[in-house]
Structure formats: structure tokens, C-alpha cells
């Protein structure tokens, strides 16, 4: 195993570390006064996810959703693996093109785009983009008339944790009119896309969306369009404790594709996985910078049923304005793990964990049983790769954590590609 540690804009490769070892090594290099928060990212985990994807969804080409985590090393790893990229803005297109990704491996998958961003996509050679209404077609007709448009349809995402169809997607009953207007505008519609939302607990939503896509596909073909792209969107789980497993979703998708889109050399099937690739690859380490004892409470929670003399409030140096913005915007539920080795029969106390800012909203964990922690000790949070680093701010002057990289089982060609990437 290797660990890659970024030092300003350079990287150095060390031998013999996994994620946990890297965390402990980095922490041992800090004193309590210097314990800034940091991530350890296992790029090898991303590679293993890719291998699982190819095994479970062999007909579907992944176009990684850049919005989920736009870290340079993540993008470089995925580019070396040959994935495509789902971009939502000119900046994301620029970022991906900047590491050498060709425009044909980019889909501009934002149904509602700023005109200047459409122009940037055109000038960058990015032709494939999504839309869901006639007004978007009119913008494209004026700005990028040679674009290859993919019609996004709405889905039943009522069981998803993060719902998207309330904002994006044309209703199936409206698609014929939209396609007819595209024909009048001489816009080339090449396929259909959808997104079932993130955190869904019902894999059958993919089956229904694929069935609806077939209906719209045939509608487009009837109107004279060369329909050859099916984009099944995102919503694939990436954490260890996901209630709906990726393999189960893949099985439903494969059955639906076999029924509605049997193998065809002219057909391209893509998806937009984000959290699937990166969620479990990142672990965040935060330092306990302050603590308070709170009045005792009577608890009755399974094995912890007892009258506790005290509970604790812990303050750490990252919060909801930083990496834990996922709690506010992605409905994440995080669990703190003490970095130190557990002590046998150590008493656990009801605890809350708070971020470092002056805002009372900055609470990371409302209630969790932990051993008593001391100022200067560390808490770890696993599965922190999705919608974390991309949403950080510098509110109150707190900066984003540094990312250190573990490389476990990475192929040589990926390592070479990473070394050639600029930070």
C-alpha cells in the first residue's frame, strides 16, 4: 500500500500505510495546539468501486458527477480509469477539461443553464447536454445550435432522501409537445435522461423510469430524431450502511434494460454516479478543542439504561459551515468514532458534538454515546467523501481541511496518471 501526502502543490508517495495507519501517523505528527482537521482519502477505494460497477452494470458507462466531490486527485483517478464526467456549470467543465478529459467524455447535465455557460460548453467542444423545457431549447438554438440534446423526464422520487423531480424533469405527458418544438427549432434531440433522487429505498423506481424512457424514446424516434442515448442518472449508494445496496439496484436496472432496451450497438447507456464513487473513500479527523459537562439525565436506551451523573458537550474544529455542510444540504447522519484505542468496559456517556463557529446552528451530532473525551483528542467520521469538501465555506475564518491520500492497490497506469496531474 502507498500513502500520498500532498504538501502545498506537490505530492510524495510513502510505503506501507492503510487509511487507519495514515490517520494515526498524521495525528502523531501534531500536538494538541496544532491539531487542524484533515481528511484521508483512499483512492484505492474509488478504484475498487469502479471494478464493482463494471461487474454489476457492464452495459452502463459511468459519467462521474463532479458536483459531488471535485477534488483534483479524485478527478484524476477517475479520468485514468476512463470514466466520463457529468458537469453542471462552466467551472466544472473547465476543471475537467483542465486535467485532459476530452469533450466527448463530458455531459453537461444541468437542465437549466446560464447562456454564457452554454456558450462556454460550445467553445469547449461539449455538445451533449440535458434539457426539460421549450425555453431551454430556445436558448440552445441561439447559442449552441449543434448541441446534442437529451430530454430529462421526471420520476417518482417520493421515497428518495434528496428529491429532484420537484425541480427538474418534464412530465411524460408533456414530452411530445417539447419534442415537436425541438423539431421546429431544428435542435437535435438524441436521447432521454432521468434521476430518481438520492437515498431512495425503492429500487423499482429505476425500473419505472427506464420504462418511461422507452416510451419517450419511441416518441422521439417517431418524430424523426436519432434517439441513441439513455442516461439513467444518479442515486447510487456509496456508504457502508446504505439500506438499499448497490448490487440490488444494479439487478433491477439490468432486468429493466433487458426488457426495454435490449443490447443494441447503436445505443449508449450512461449514468451519473457521484456518492457511489467517493462517499466511503474519505475519512475526516477532527480535534476536540473544548468540552463542557452538562447536567445529569435519566436515560433508557437499551444497554445504556442507567442514571448518568453527567453528559458532555464536545466542540471540534470543523462543523456545518465546513465539511459537515452535508448535514444541512444532503440530509447526512454522521457518527463520531474516537481515534484512540478503546478501554475495556469504559463507561459511555450521552454526548453532543458541536462545530467551532459562533452559530448555535453549528451542531454535528445531537446525541451519541461516547467515552469521556479530553481536549486534544481526536474524533473520526467515516463515509465523508460525498457533498462535503465541495460545500465548505470560510465562515468565521475557519478554513477547509487538508486532504491526504492513501493509495491502496492502485494500478500502475493510474499512479502514473496521478503523478502527471497538476494540483
From Swiss-Prot:
Keyword terms of this UniProt record: Decarboxylase, Lyase, Polyamine biosynthesis, Pyridoxal phosphate
One Pfam family from the record: Orn_DAP_Arg_deC
Binding site for pyridoxal 5'-phosphate: 198, 235, 272-275, 387
Assembly mode: Homodimer. Only the dimer is catalytically active, as the active sites are constructed of residues from both monomers.
SUPFAM superfamilies cross-referenced by the UniProt entry: Alanine racemase C-terminal domain-like, PLP-binding barrel
Catalytic residues of the enzyme: 358
A GO biological-process term: putrescine biosynthetic process from arginine, via ornithine
Physiological role: Catalyzes the first and rate-limiting step of polyamine biosynthesis that converts ornithine into putrescine, which is the precursor for the polyamines, spermidine and spermine. Polyamines are essential for cell proliferation and are implicated in cellular processes, ranging from DNA replication to apoptosis.
Reaction(s) this enzyme catalyzes, per UniProt: L-ornithine + H(+) = putrescine + CO2
GO CC terms, sorted: cytoplasm
Family statement drawn from the similarity comment of this UniProt entry: Belongs to the Orn/Lys/Arg decarboxylase class-II family.
N6-(pyridoxal phosphate)lysine: residues carrying this PTM: 67
Cofactor(s) the protein needs: pyridoxal 5'-phosphate
UniProt protein name: Ornithine decarboxylase
Protein residues bound to substrate: 329-330, 359
E.C. code: 4.1.1.17
Activity-regulation annotation: Inhibited by antizyme (AZ) in response to polyamine levels. AZ inhibits the assembly of the functional homodimer by binding to ODC monomers and targeting them for ubiquitin-independent proteolytic destruction by the 26S proteasome.
Stacks against the aromatic ring of pyridoxal phosphate and stabilizes reaction intermediates, annotated site positions: 195
InterPro entries reported in the protein's UniProt record: Ala_racemase/Decarboxylase_C, De-COase2_C, De-COase2_N, De-COase2_pyr-phos_BS, Orn/DAP/Arg_de-COase, Orn_de-COase, PLP-binding_barrel
Keyword Lyase: yes
Amino acid at each position: 500500500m502507498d500513502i500520498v501526502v500532498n504538501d502545498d502543490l506537490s505530492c510524495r508517495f510513502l510505503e506501507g500505510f492503510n487509511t487507519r495507519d495514515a490517520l494515526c501517523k498524521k495525528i502523531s505528527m501534531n500536538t494538541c495546539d496544532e491539531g487542524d482537521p484533515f481528511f484521508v482519502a483512499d483512492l484505492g477505494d474509488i478504484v475498487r468501486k469502479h471494478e464493482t460497477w463494471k461487474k454489476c452494470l457492464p452495459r452502463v458507462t459511468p459519467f462521474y458527477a463532479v458536483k459531488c466531490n471535485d477534488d483534483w486527485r479524485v478527478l484524476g483517478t477517475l479520468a485514468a480509469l476512463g470514466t466520463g464526467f457529468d458537469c453542471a456549470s462552466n467551472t466544472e467543465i473547465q476543471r475537467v477539461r483542465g486535467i485532459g478529459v476530452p469533450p466527448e467524455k463530458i455531459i453537461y447535465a444541468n437542465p437549466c443553464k446560464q447562456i454564457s455557460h452554454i456558450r462556454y460548453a460550445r467553445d469547449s467542444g461539449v455538445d451533449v447536454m440535458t434539457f426539460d423545457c421549450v425555453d431551454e431549447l430556445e436558448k440552445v438554438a441561439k447559442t449552441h445550435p449543434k448541441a446534442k440534446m437529451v430530454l430529462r423526464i421526471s420520476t417518482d422520487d417520493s421515497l428518495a432522501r434528496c428529491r429532484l423531480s420537484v425541480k427538474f424533469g418534464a412530465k411524460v405527458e408533456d414530452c411530445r409537445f417539447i419534442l415537436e418544438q425541438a423539431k421546429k427549432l431544428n435542435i437535435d434531440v438524441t436521447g432521454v435522461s432521468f434521476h430518481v433522487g438520492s437515498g431512495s429505498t425503492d429500487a423499482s423506481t429505476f425500473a419505472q423510469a427506464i420504462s418511461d424512457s422507452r416510451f419517450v424514446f419511441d416518441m422521439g424516434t417517431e418524430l424523426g430524431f436519432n434517439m441513441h442515448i439513455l442516461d439513467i442518472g444518479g442515486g447510487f449508494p456509496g456508504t457502508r450502511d446504505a439500506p438499499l445496496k448497490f448490487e440490488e439496484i444494479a439487478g433491477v436496472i439490468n432486468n429493466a434494460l433487458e426488457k426495454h432496451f435490449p443490447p443494441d450497438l447503436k445505443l449508449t447507456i450512461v449514468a451519473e454516479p457521484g456518492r457511489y464513487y467517493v462517499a466511503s473513500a474519505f475519512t475526516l479527523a477532527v480535534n476536540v478543542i473544548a468540552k463542557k459537562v452538562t447536567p445529569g439525565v435519566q436515560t433508557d436506551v437499551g444497554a445504556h439504561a442507567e442514571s448518568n451523573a453527567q453528559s458532555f458537550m464536545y466542540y471540534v474544529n470543523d462543523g456545518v459551515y465546513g465539511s459537515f455542510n452535508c448535514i444541512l444540504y444532503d440530509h447526512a447522519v454522521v457518527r463520531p468514532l474516537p481515534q484512540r484505542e478503546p478501554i475495556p468496559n469504559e463507561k459511555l456517556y450521552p454526548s453532543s458534538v458541536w462545530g467551532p463557529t459562533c452559530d448555535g446552528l453549528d451542531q454535528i451530532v445531537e446525541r451519541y454515546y461516547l467515552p469521556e473525551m479530553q481536549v486534544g483528542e481526536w474524533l473520526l467520521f467515516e463515509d465523508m467523501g460525498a457533498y462535503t469538501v465541495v460545500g465548505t465555506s470560510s465562515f468565521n475564518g475557519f478554513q477547509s481541511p487538508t486532504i491526504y491520500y492513501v493509495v491502496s492497490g492502485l494500478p500502475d497506469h493510474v499512479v502514473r496518471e496521478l503523478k502527471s496531474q497538476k494540483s
